[in-house]
Amino acid sequence: MNTMALDQLEPNDIFFQKILHYGMRDKTIQDVLLLEKKPATAKGENYLSYLTRFTLGYTCGVSDRPNEKNQKKVHLIMKEEPETSGETLRYIREGKIFHNERYILEEVVPKIEKLVGKKLGPKVYYFSNNPSVIVMEDLMTLGFQNKNRKVGFNEADVSIVLENMADFHAGSIYLEEQNPGCMSEIENGFIGPNLPEGFFTFIASGVKSIGAGVRDWQNGRFVSISDKLGKKSKEIIQELKVIYECDENELRTLNHGDIWMNNVMFKSDKNGKTQESCFVSNSKLI
């Protein structure tokens, strides 16, 4: 398989059966067929990966009726390296972005979920290191949705996200206490010594642009804020390097590191009240 794997495969490729055998631990599954596929995000929203939403149909055995078969469907997300090259692709591979996320989602998050008694992220169905591919459950089919980015989060949404973050942090600390060294696989976070200098420059330029953008708001009311952001743009690179440096003597916790609207999904009741949330991506440790 190459990048954009689903575009290279026939609908009945054996790869789809491998996904379900691994993810469902059910060897009676057969006749697996790709029924539908489409991009999971808008162009430009994920620069470190490419996401595809797809549906598989299959048959499987019935436990108490060995001569019968059930026909079922499963809805999944495939995460792959993006169609890019050069510095970005080198960073993705050298920074072990896919390895870290797969390890967290498959090896760490399920254990934390057992400790805290709630779902925190999607189940992993399959992974490959070469090429870098992660297949996980599609949370939308479980009733989870992203919030409207133009509307944002309300107070109840923020409260639930903060509760999940607290459970995630505390659970990771307790898990490390129970199983010393289990976090050693993922000690390198997103921002670290291997991050290309171009990424730091991109961050600094973004802060500077925001400062310039707010300078003329409301007849100069935010000039002081603009000045602060301009100053911060010159300091932020070194500050980030210090903040993300791992300190063996401090209390260490698994940290999501990329909490924004696309990486949090919510489930609501029939009245639209938020009931629970899940993190879509987990890949950072500080």
Where are these regions (language model features)?
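ATP-binding pocket architecture of kinase catalytic cores
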Residues: 75-77, 82-97, 108-189
